[in-house]
Amino acid sequence: MFHIVLVEPEIPPNTGNVIRLAANTGCMLHLVEPLGFSMEDPLMRRAGLDYHEYAEVRRHPGWTALLRDMQPDLSRMFALTTHGTQSVYDTGFLPGDWFVFGAESRGLPPELRETFPPAQRLRLPMLPNQRSLNLSNAVAVTVYEAWRQNSFLTPPTQPQPA
């Protein structure tokens, strides 16, 4: 389906929530290190409940490693940022697209964000003078909009519990 990328996430329950979202939508979750917590953190595990076994989660030692190992189509990668120039709702998404989110306290590093063409720097609408949405909420809104655009197409295969 879609690829969710969290670059240097800091808050365990947010990542747990995104793991649960990935399991329920058929998305693959990519975690770009360093992480601000242990993958065994009880708060992260609690937020993800028993969905960890249903989600496909890959860890990457850095952004360059993700690009090298996964070889994504760069034209289908979207940076979600409050500095975005285009709304998620004005963008057409395709199965296999990549949604890249930054750390909770600082977003995407500017040097990474600037590698995305302006049309691939997306934002979620908010009221003026508001800083940002919670990371897991922003991921959920984006994934569900992309999935809606694709008629809630079910992925061909679902990861099975071990």
UniProtKB/Swiss-Prot annotation:
SUPFAM superfamilies reported in the protein's UniProt record: alpha/beta knot
InterPro entries attached to this UniProt entry: Alpha/beta_knot_MTases, SpoU_MeTrfase, TrmL, tRNA_m1G_MTases_N
GO molecular function, one term: tRNA (cytidine(34)-2'-O)-methyltransferase activity
Binding, S-adenosyl-L-methionine: L80, G102, L124, S132
Family, similarity comment: Belongs to the class IV-like SAM-binding methyltransferase superfamily. RNA methyltransferase TrmH family. TrmL subfamily.
Task performed by this protein: Methylates the ribose at the nucleotide 34 wobble position in the two leucyl isoacceptors tRNA(Leu)(CmAA) and tRNA(Leu)(cmnm5UmAA). Catalyzes the methyl transfer from S-adenosyl-L-methionine to the 2'-OH of the wobble nucleotide.
Full protein name: tRNA (cytidine(34)-2'-O)-methyltransferase
Organism, scientific name: Acidovorax sp. (strain JS42)
Lineage: Bacteria, Pseudomonadati, Pseudomonadota, Betaproteobacteria, Burkholderiales
Gene: trmL
